[in-house]
Amino acid sequence: DYDYMTSEIDSLIPTSYTINNDTYALVIGNQNYRFVPGVPYAIHDARVFKEYCEKTLGIPSENIHLVEDGTKAMINEEEFQWLENISNRENKKLIVYYAGHGVPDTKDRNKAYMLPTDVRGTKPQNGISLNDFYGRIGDLAFEQTSVFLDACFSGINRDNESVNEGMRGTE
């Protein structure tokens, strides 16, 4: 695990007295990866984002799904099933937050992927394509959707280690 340094932004979360029953949030924090170096603080950041959703945005906790160390199946199947089961989506809002590895496609610079915790960095195409992810989110037809990606998509982590095994970063 990581030694967390907290700041005021983590603890002095503004509180609103508004309740937004028609807003939902899918919050994903991928920190501990099976095949590639981890993403320090991703779970912590996801938990803090969830807390902001509850306290500041007034989203009821039952309208928020927090996924920690999400596998491809968890994200593609379980979480999208949860979103699909929300009725009257055309009158509701969705917020999606992802903290974790983003991986570029080494063959096509116009493609990028979110890396679930059970996918190898050598085959980013086995991850979750951003184009497909945005398409699926759009097909859900919420009234409004906001997506926050806390991922760099360079293929290199903070320690200059490659997420795409067999490659390394340069300075």
In which residue ranges do the predicted regions lie?
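Boundary/activation segment at the start of structured domains
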Residues: 1-112
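Alpha-helical scaffolding within the catalytic cores
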Residues: 8-13, 131-132, 170
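Caspase-like (clan CD) cysteine peptidase catalytic core
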Residues: 22, 76-99, 103-162
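Short, intrinsically disordered, charge-balanced linker/junction segments flanking boundaries
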Residues: 165-171
